[in-house]
């Protein structure tokens, strides 16, 4: 469990954390890590590459140094290993666009709503649900394109953790632009998938599916997952990041619906921000749950023991809840009994 804070400096580290976030985002918006990937640079060289004044570039680089993203030696700045692996455009595991576009441009300002959301007094015109948010086609597109990059890592983890070798039909409820479905279909040549998603997201997703050459195996049903008819007799049902974005009062019925739409022997997979039952963390899971509360005030903080019990109560066997993205998400799985 977390060691409790004792000093004012530790509290300041939490209170001023937003400054480090913005330093990272500003560097991403200016392509700084991508330029530094070529090799160490002075502040003047980095500024020239980014089109920024050298002194302001030095101030930004110093902040990045202080938070551990870049190193400084003899006046030259270089990416750390983490920056090179994850923040450089075109790197294999680059998720800079997800951080820059979704987290900074969308999640960051939405967190301004947290006080009102906690008091359940979001003003008229505030974003009060994903349905509100994604009614705007531009917002849906920005979110979806950045989320697609952010979902590929979890999708690869899901391939490793869920046995879908005998599955033919996958239902992906709230499947976004298809990062999960595409990755699963690529790993399992006999699998086909149906994704239920908001129309503005489905439009973006169809293009990703086509680009992957999978339009014959992955189809979309346009609609709100909570109100749309799902196809039955599925071999697998997936809900990834659905629960954190819907009212907590819908959770039990969604688990029952998954059971009802599976064939006997079918597998239910639920991937989301899940904390430990003792409420001690993990830190990123807990913070992401709070983030979702800012624009889904009816959201509920999921914990592993509750999920396991809810799967059991719905009739699933072989129930397990295990960490997926380390320190952030968990994958709950259950099988509908029978052959």
Give the role of each language-model region.
Residues 1-72, 82, 173-339:
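Alpha-helical subdomain
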Residues 14-22, 26-29, 34-35, 40, ...:
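Conserved Class I S-adenosyl-L-methionine-dependent methyltransferase catalytic core
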């Amino acid at each position: 469990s977390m060691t409790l804070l004792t000093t004012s400096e530790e509290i300041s580290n939490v209170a001023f954390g937003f400054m480090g976030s913005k330093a990272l985002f500003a560097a991403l918006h200016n392509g700084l890590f991508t330029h530094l990937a070529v090799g160490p640079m002075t502040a003047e060289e980095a500024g020239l590459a980014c089109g920024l004044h050298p002194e302001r570039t030095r101030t930004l680089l110093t902040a990045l140094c202080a938070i551990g993203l870049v190193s400084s030696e003899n006046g030259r700045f270089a990416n750390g290993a983490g920056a090179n692996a994850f923040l450089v455009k075109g790197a294999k595991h680059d998720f800079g666009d997800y951080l820059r576009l979704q987290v900074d441009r969308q999640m960051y300002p939405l967190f301004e709503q947290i006080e009102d959301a906690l008091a359940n007094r979001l003003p008229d015109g505030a974003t009060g649900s994903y349905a509100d948010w994604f009614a705007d086609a531009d917002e849906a597109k920005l979110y979806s394109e950045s989320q697609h990059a952010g979902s590929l890592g979890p999708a690869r983890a899901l391939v490793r953790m869920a046995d879908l070798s005998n599955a033919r039909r996958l239902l992906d409820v709230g499947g976004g632009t298809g990062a999960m479905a595409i990755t699963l279909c690529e790993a399992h040549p006999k699998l086909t998938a149906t994704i239920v998603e908001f129309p503005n997201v489905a439009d973006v997703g169809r293009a990703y599916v086509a680009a992957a050459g999978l339009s014959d195996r992955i189809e979309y049903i346009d609609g709100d997952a909570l109100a749309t008819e799902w196809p039955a007799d599925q071999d697998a049902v997936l809900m990834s990041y659905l629960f954190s974005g819907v009212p907590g009062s819908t959770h039990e019925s969604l688990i029952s619906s998954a059971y009802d739409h599976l064939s006997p022997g079918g597998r239910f997979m639920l991937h989301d921000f899940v904390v430990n039952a003792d409420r001690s963390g993990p830190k990123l899971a807990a913070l992401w749950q709070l983030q979702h509360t800012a624009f889904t005030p009816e959201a509920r903080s999921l914990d592993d023991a509750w999920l396991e019990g809810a799967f059991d109560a719905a009739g699933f066997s072989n129930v397990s809840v295990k960490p997926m993205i380390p320190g952030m998400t968990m994958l709950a799985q259950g099988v509908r009994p029978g052959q």
